[in-house]
Amino acid sequence: MATPEILRKYREPIVARLEGVLQERGPLGEMFSYHMGLQEADGSPGPGIGGKLLRPSLVCFSCEALGGQIDAALPLAVALELVHNFSLIHDDIQDKDELRRGRPTVWKVYGVEQAINAGDGLLVLALHSSLEAKTLAAEMSLAAQKTLLSATYRMIEGQVLDLSLEGRAAGVAEYLDMARKKTGALIGCALELGGIAAGADEGLRGKLRALGEVLGLAFQIRDDWIGIWGDPEVTGKPVGSDLLRRKRSFPVAYALERDPSLEELLAQDPFPLEEVLRRLESTGSKEATAGEARKYVREADRIAAGLPWEPWAKIAFGELLSFLVDREA
């Protein structure tokens, strides 16, 4: 599937600015550069900044869609991406994940204690970057700070909820509350920050935030589908990888509401993957998960239709929605 315009158009300026921000030297800078893919642990060149860069791309898109200039949005876009990466470093510690994008995680290379410091440092860099949006009026700059901090807090709340779901039969409502915060908060923040950079009023900013939160749910639920039924040749992970990690994702929450006895299987060691997959199929979880992601894509499309975006932006956003709901990785 072709990469949508929104994820192509802004990648180069975002990467260039990220590389400029990540010039910190010393042990802390070394960990930043390693995590972001700029260098390996031995100091040799890394694979480069990876990932979709969805959040910072949405900041830039949201600004331009309202007639704003990308230069006003870039510092905020980079700030949001750094917040996201602060959360990834800490999530890897909490989830005991040893690999990220095919490379050992920061805590596996540098130890848990130093990885915590690296995450904290990225958060500070993020806040510093958000102050570099010098073309914004003081009122809008303050609004951007409040928006970023509020979304970061809600994202952390979501991580707390995510950890609390482990080992118990949480249902769909609890899952959605968690995902709306853990994933939706930063994606909502992305569209709102872009609106701030373009000078949007509070009413419009609220609509942008709501759109992003719905988009975040669609993104996360599709991610959950891929984490269980994704093609290993595309994802680089085995079928059922999220199940093997004991992750309480949407498919599991949906299935548990229909087959509570599944909880006993989920607790077994060694993990009975084939039987769990069979139970998920029997509850209709696979189809329901795909349908739930499509539901939120339709809701996002409805909200976007009412926004005062330029015509090209509505086309580009529709392309992004199709990509997110059908993507395989």
Question: What is the predicted function of each stretch?
Answer:
Residues 113, 117, 151, 155-159:
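Mid-bilayer segments of alpha-helical transmembrane spans in multi-pass integral membrane proteins
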Residues 276-329:
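C-terminal charged capping/lid subdomain of soluble metabolic enzymes
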Residues 58, 126, 158, 252, ...:
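Residue-level signal for inorganic ion chemistry
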Residues 60-64, 127-132, 192, 196, ...:
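Short glycine/serine- and small hydrophobic-enriched flexible loop segments
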Residues 47, 100-123, 169-183, 206-210, ...:
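Divalent-cation-assisted or electrostatically stabilized phosphate/pyrophosphate-binding catalytic cores
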Residues 73-97, 149-154, 184-188, 192-195, ...:
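Active-site alpha-helical segments that house and flank conserved acidic catalytic motifs
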Residues 1-83, 89, 93-108, 160-169, ...:
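Conserved N-terminal diphosphate/IPP-binding helix and adjacent helical/loop segment
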Residues 130-149, 259, 286:
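Transmembrane helix-loop-helix
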